[in-house]
Amino acid sequence: MPHTLPETELHNPQSTKPPLDPHLKALENEAIHIFREVAAEFERPVMLYSIGKDSSVLLHLARKAFYPGRIPFPLLHVDTGWKFREMIAFRDEMVAKYDLDLVAHTNPRGAAENVTPFTHGSALYTDIMKTEALRQALDAGQYDAAFGGARRDEEASRAKERIYSFRTPDHRWDPRNQRPELWNVYNGMIRKGESVRAFPLSNWTEVDIWRYIQAEDIPIVPLYFAKKRPVVERDGMLILAEDPRLELLPGEVKREEVIRFRTLGCFPLTGAIRSEADTLDDIIAELETATVSERQGRAIDRDQAGSMEKKKREGYF
């Protein structure tokens, strides 16, 4: 059944915007159904909020799912201290604008030991500041379900993960031990200490995300749009060179290029792409002819063969 809303900023009958096409409407309905199912089945759900485009769509869908009430669970942001400055500013703007309950967590051990992408390398840094930090935050909040914005088209290990992804008491995932999911029937039974990661965007593609952002006029971090920015080329990636903590290596030169980001994370580990796409129409047109995954710009996915699956088995997003 379609999910409609009274006249609000989320749904305005007087709007001149065309209605969602049937494909996007079906994806929206599925996602809203998943949000409501998890909220009804679990005692302490939480939504992982990484501030990127998928999180922005996830937040919009959550607001739709529970209108006219507030979102009935907090948002959790694992703050490594190395996100793009524009991401943190955007996060704070969204929290204030929509009166969100945000929990931000930084791994105290990592902060005390000054763990950084530069000093510890991407693999160890990600394990301590992201995976370990996420497990800490989930334990501290005693959350039994966590919404995430992962999509199956992103990466091989995510392609085989169910919408309800079951985790052991220490948050580990076993891809060989997944439950069947028949149509829209989800089995949320868990033992004490276990939890579920739920992925309402599982069946969306990157282009679906952008078309929905355009159709619903969803705010996103400006870094997704092309403009001239300072960059340095390192390990085959274009790294944004705005943060004073980025020290140039011998032979490196900072220069201005017209770039944008297809994916956002910690700035030292996230590569930009050369692009002139500075509007939503341009971004969608660019992606329709893209031949590589958006995660090609993530250094953490290059650590070793199967690195993402290894991280997910250990409790990563």
Swiss-Prot record:
It is an enzyme of class 2 (transferase). Pathway: Sulfur metabolism; hydrogen sulfide biosynthesis; sulfite from sulfate: step 1/3. SUPFAM superfamilies: Adenine nucleotide alpha hydrolases-like (SSF52402). Residues 1-10 have a biased composition (Basic and acidic residues). One of its GO terms (molecular function) is sulfate adenylyltransferase (ATP) activity. Heterodimer composed of CysD, the smaller subunit, and CysN. HAMAP family: Sulf_adenylyltr_sub2. This is Sulfate adenylyltransferase subunit 2. The gene is cysD.
